[in-house]
Amino acid sequence: MTTFDAFTQLARGRRTSLVMEPDRAVDHDIIDQLCELASWAPSHKRTWPWRFASFTGDGRSRLGTTMATDMADADFGDDAKRTKTQGKYLRAPAVVVVGCEPHPNEMLHLENRDAVAAAIQNLLLGATALGLASFWSTPALTRPPKVLDLCSFSPDDRIVGVVYLGWPG
């Protein structure tokens, strides 16, 4: 099998799935490896705009509560939507929030966001190669101040995706 054939098989085999073993943890070393792999995505002008924050265990609940608080502060969604948000990050054993450093130049900002999307694809392909299930979602708010702080992101950063990771169920 050629490298191209192996890559084609990997890319075609990647699926979006939240069917995961809820109690089987994803090791922090694996999450770190996936984030490092993600950082090999191309970025024009070497801006390296991606930001990663991972949540496991009780951290997922903190993420949900913090996002729901930001939603309430922004008067976004009703109580039912905020309540749903509080628990949604418990759907997978690991959650990676992926942020993007903005750029004042609109064209460079768009290029940065594209680079972060490419980084997420690298992360998803790496997860598939390791046998993990994955799901890329977009949060209700892309600039939630308390979530950005929880993630140790800059207040100006934007969230491009939330990636759920777990072992297939």
Predicted regions and their residues:
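Short coil/turn connectors at secondary-structure junctions
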Residues: 91-94, 132, 155-159
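Small-aliphatic-rich amphipathic alpha-helix that forms the alpha element of a beta-alpha
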Residues: 38, 102-150
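N-terminal amphipathic, basic helical "cap/leader" segment at the start of enzyme domains
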Residues: 1-91
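Short, charged/polar surface micro-motifs in flexible loops or helix N-caps
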Residues: 57-62, 68-69, 102-104, 145, ...
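A glycine-rich helix N-cap at a beta->alpha junction
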Residues: 75, 151-169
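Short, histidine-centered active-site or binding-site loop motifs used for metal coordination
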Residues: 15, 100-102
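Active-site-flanking beta-strand signature of metal-NTP-handling nucleotidyl enzymes
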Residues: 95-99
